[in-house]
């Protein structure tokens, strides 16, 4: 199989699954489905508590930087490649992007917990 056939099959399968996912579900909204569930009992307090947006932004920032660090984990194995200079340039670019993102978050006070 050549590469174009594999790509075409992947795109076709993806589009088919997306279309089936949109057509299959029947959106029957019941009031019971919208109510919060707390271990079979009626909730003791409101389930719609305010959520700290600052916590959400710090959590998203952590996930982004954690993903970038996970991209650096294969570097020890990549050093064994034939094109070591290309690997080092790509690693340097990735670390630079990570550092610029951290500097931007720091200057915008995105890492400050209190305001």
Curated annotation (Swiss-Prot):
Q: Which UniProt keywords apply?
A: Electron transport, Membrane, Mitochondrion, Mitochondrion inner membrane, NAD, Respiratory chain, Translocase, Transmembrane, Transmembrane helix, Transport, Ubiquinone
Organism expressing this protein natively: Mus musculus (Mouse)
Q: What is its EC number?
A: 7.1.1.2
Where can this protein be found?
Mitochondrion inner membrane
Which reactions are catalysed by this chain? a ubiquinone + NADH + 5 H(+)(in) = a ubiquinol + NAD(+) + 4 H(+)(out)
Domain of life here? Eukaryota
Q: How does it assemble?
A: Core subunit of respiratory chain NADH dehydrogenase (Complex I) which is composed of 45 different subunits. Interacts with TMEM186. Interacts with TMEM242.
Q: Which InterPro entries match?
A: NADH_UbQ/plastoQ_OxRdtase_su3, NDAH_ubi_oxred_su3_sf
One Gene Ontology term, aspect cellular component: respiratory chain complex I
User: What family does the entry list?
Assistant: Belongs to the complex I subunit 3 family.
Query: Sorted alphabetically, which Pfam families does this protein's record hold?
Result: Oxidored_q4
The answer to whether keyword Translocase applies is yes
The encoding gene is: mt-Nd3
Predominant cellular place of this UniProt entry's protein: mitochondrion
| TM region positions | 3-23, 55-75, 86-106
> Biological process GO annotation list?
aerobic respiration; cellular response to glucocorticoid stimulus; mitochondrial electron transport, NADH to ubiquinone; proton motive force-driven mitochondrial ATP synthesis; response to light intensity; response to oxidative stress
Its biological purpose is as follows: Core subunit of the mitochondrial membrane respiratory chain NADH dehydrogenase (Complex I) which catalyzes electron transfer from NADH through the respiratory chain, using ubiquinone as an electron acceptor. Essential for the catalytic activity of complex I.
* Single GO term (MF): NADH dehydrogenase (ubiquinone) activity
Q: What is this protein called?
A: NADH-ubiquinone oxidoreductase chain 3
Identify its membrane topology class: Multi-pass membrane protein
| Group of enzyme by EC | translocase
């Amino acid at each position: 199989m050549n590469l174009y056939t594999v790509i075409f099959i992947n795109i076709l399968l993806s589009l088919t699954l997306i279309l089936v996912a949109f057509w299959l579900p029947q959106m029957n909204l019941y009031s019971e489905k919208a109510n919060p569930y707390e271990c079979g009992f009626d909730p003791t307090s409101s389930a719609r508590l305010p959520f700290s947006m600052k916590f959400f932004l710090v959590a998203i920032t952590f996930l982004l930087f954690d993903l970038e660090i996970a991209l650096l984990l294969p570097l020890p194995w990549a050093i064994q490649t034939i094109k070591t200079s290309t690997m080092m340039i790509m690693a340097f670019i990735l670390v630079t992007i990570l550092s610029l993102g951290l500097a931007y978050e720091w200057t915008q006070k995105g890492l400050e917990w209190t305001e």
